[in-house]
C-alpha cells in the first residue's frame, strides 16, 4: 500500500466451504445449541428473521422437499453424529467472523477505515447439501460413492470417534438437512438455480465517509455481477474495452451505488438468468420463472439422470414483489407471463453461451470426459502434502496401481 494511492483487496477465506475444520474450543461453544434438529432450527431462524426485519413481513416459510429427510426420522443412534457436524460448522463460521473483525480493526488502527468501502458478501451460493446424509468425507458425494451412516460411524470410531470431526483426520460435511435450514426461508440448496436457497446470500456494505449507517434492508434485486460496475461508478472510471491487446466482454451488471443513500432507489437491474446443472431460472422486473432440473444435490448416488430431457421440464412462476420466498407458483394463473419469461431465458442463455443446457450432468454420467492431468504416473515422497485435484491421480472411481518402496528397520 502506498499512502498516496488507493488500494484494492479481494479477500476470500476457505470458510465456510467444506470440509469443515476448526479448533475444538470453537466447536464446543455450540454443543447443545441445535439439539432440536434442522426442522426446529429452521422454524426458529425464520421467526428471528421476521422479528429483525431481515425478510419482509408476510414472507412464508417454504416446505421441506419430499425427498429431504425430517429430523424426527433420523435414527436416535445417529443424531449425536449429525449434531456434532453442525457444532463444527458453527464454530468454523464464528472463527471466520472473528478474522473479518481483525481485518476491519486493523484498517481502523491504520486510519484507512473511514474512506475504505467494504463489501462483505457472506457466501458464493446457498448452503451446500453435498454432505448429503452427513459425511466424514465430502468427496463421497462428489465421486457419487454410495455409503451409509453406519459405515461412516464405524470408520470414525477407528480414528477417535466424534472428537475427530473438525480435525485433519477427516473431511467432514454436515447433513443436507442443516443446509436446508441454513437457506431459510427459501427452498433448496446450493446447485439449485430454480430456488433462492441455492443462490441468495446476505451482503453488508460499509463506507463511513460516504454512507450513513442505517438498518433498513435494501429490497433491490442484485447479482454478484453488479459489484464491479458499482465500484467503477463510485470511483468514476470506465470499463476498459481492451486489456493487454485482448478485447473485453461487455459488462453484464448494473451499478447499485444509488442504494447507498436511498433505500427506495430505482433498481437498475432488470434481468438476470441462472443455470446450474440444468436447474435454471430467469429474473425480470420482479418476476421469476424457474424449473428445478434433474439433480437433487442432497440425494446420494441419484439414479435416472441419464433419462433427463430438458424439454420436458415443468416451469414455475413467482411474483417476487409479493412472494419473497417463492412459496406460491403462479404459472397456472399467468401462462402468458411464464411463456414470456421462458423465451427470455432462452435468449439470455444464447447470449451468454450457456448451451447445451445441463452440460454438467454429462460429466457426472461420463467421468471419463472430465479434463484431467495428462500424466499417467506420479512419484510422491514425504515432502508431498497436498496438490490440486486436477493435477493429481484420479482416485475417485478409477482403478490405480500403487507401488510403495519402503525401508523398515528391524
Q: Where are the model-predicted features located?
A:
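Short glycine/proline-rich turn/loop motifs
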Residues: 68-85, 206-212, 321-326, 383-385
Amino acid at each position: 500500500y502506498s499512502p498516496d494511492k488507493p488500494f484494492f483487496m479481494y479477500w476470500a477465506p476457505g470458510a465456510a466451504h467444506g470440509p469443515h475444520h476448526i479448533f475444538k474450543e470453537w466447536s464446543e461453544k455450540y454443543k447443545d445449541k441445535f439439539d432440536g434438529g434442522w426442522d426446529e432450527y429452521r422454524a426458529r431462524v425464520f421467526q428471528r428473521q421476521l422479528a429483525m426485519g431481515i425478510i419482509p413481513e408476510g414472507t412464508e416459510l417454504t416446505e421441506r422437499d419430499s425427498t429431504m429427510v425430517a429430523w424426527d426420522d433420523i435414527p436416535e443412534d445417529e443424531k449425536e453424529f449429525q449434531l456434532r457436524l453442525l457444532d463444527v460448522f458453527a464454530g468454523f463460521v464464528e472463527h471466520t467472523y472473528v478474522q473479518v473483525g481483525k481485518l476491519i480493526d486493523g484498517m481502523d488502527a491504520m486510519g484507512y477505515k473511514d474512506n475504505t468501502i467494504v463489501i462483505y458478501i457472506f457466501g458464493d451460493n446457498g448452503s451446500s447439501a453435498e454432505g448429503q446424509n452427513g459425511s466424514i468425507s465430502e468427496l463421497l458425494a462428489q465421486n457419487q460413492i454410495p455409503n451409509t451412516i453406519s459405515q461412516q460411524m464405524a470408520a470414525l470410531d477407528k480414528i477417535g470417534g466424534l472428537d475427530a470431526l473438525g480435525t485433519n483426520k477427516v473431511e467432514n460435511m454436515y447433513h443436507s438437512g442443516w443446509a436446508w435450514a441454513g437457506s431459510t426461508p427459501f427452498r433448496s440448496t446450493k446447485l439449485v438455480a430454480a430456488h433462492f436457497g441455492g443462490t441468495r446470500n446476505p451482503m453488508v456494505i460499509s463506507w463511513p465517509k460516504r454512507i450513513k449507517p442505517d438498518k433498513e434492508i435494501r429490497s433491490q434485486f442484485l447479482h454478484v455481477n453488479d459489484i464491479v460496475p458499482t465500484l467503477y461508478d463510485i470511483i468514476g472510471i470506465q470499463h476498459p474495452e481492451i486489456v493487454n491487446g485482448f478485447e473485453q466482454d461487455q459488462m453484464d451488471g448494473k451499478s447499485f451505488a444509488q442504494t447507498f443513500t436511498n433505500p427506495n432507489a430505482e433498481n437498475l437491474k432488470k434481468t438476470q438468468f441462472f443455470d446450474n446443472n440444468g436447474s435454471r431460472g430467469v429474473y425480470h422486473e420482479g418476476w421469476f420463472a424457474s424449473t428445478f432440473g434433474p439433480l437433487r444435490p442432497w440425494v446420494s448416488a441419484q439414479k435416472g439422470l441419464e433419462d433427463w430431457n430438458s424439454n420436458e421440464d415443468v416451469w414455475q412462476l413467482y411474483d417476487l414483489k409479493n412472494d419473497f420466498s417463492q412459496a406460491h407458483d403462479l404459472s397456472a394463473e399467468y401462462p402468458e407471463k411464464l411463456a414470456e419469461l421462458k423465451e427470455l431465458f432462452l435468449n439470455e442463455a444464447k447470449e451468454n453461451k450457456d448451451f447445451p443446457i445441463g452440460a454438467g450432468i454429462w460429466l457426472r454420467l461420463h467421468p471419463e470426459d472430465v479434463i484431467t492431468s495428462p500424466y499417467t504416473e506420479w512419484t510422491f515422497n514425504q515432502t508431498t502434502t497436498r496438490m490440486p485435484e486436477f493435477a493429481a491421480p484420479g482416485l475417485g472411481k478409477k482403478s490405480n496401481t500403487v507401488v510403495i518402496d519402503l525401508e523398515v528397520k528391524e
